[in-house]
């Protein structure tokens, strides 16, 4: 796994309080990890902060799985 993927996975694990093994490329934040819409907004904000980027709202709405993340 790349450094970026490792960093994304760490954010997901920390923000959603899930086990690292449960986070795969196709893991749905909502369906598989029990996140709600506020959780997904917080994840996007954490990705933006970690990587020093801004994710437009329309792009943020498409981030539903670990594999969709930046």
Swiss-Prot record:
One of its GO terms (cellular component) is cytosol. 4'-phosphopantetheine is transferred from CoA to a specific serine of apo-ACP by AcpS. This modification is essential for activity because fatty acids are bound in thioester linkage to the sulfhydryl of the prosthetic group. Keywords: Cytoplasm, Fatty acid biosynthesis, Fatty acid metabolism, Lipid biosynthesis, Lipid metabolism, Phosphopantetheine, Phosphoprotein. One of its GO terms (biological process) is lipid A biosynthetic process. Pfam families: PP-binding. Its main location: cytoplasm. Pathway: Lipid metabolism; fatty acid biosynthesis. One of its GO terms (molecular function) is acyl binding. The modification O-(pantetheine 4'-phosphoryl)serine is found at residue 37. Residues 2-70 form the Carrier domain. InterPro entries: ACP (IPR003231), ACP-like_sf (IPR036736), PKS_PP-bd (IPR020806), PP-bd_ACP (IPR009081), Ppantetheine_attach_site (IPR006162). It is found in: Cytoplasm. Transmembrane segments: none annotated. Carrier of the growing fatty acid chain in fatty acid biosynthesis. Belongs to the acyl carrier protein (ACP) family. This is Acyl carrier protein.
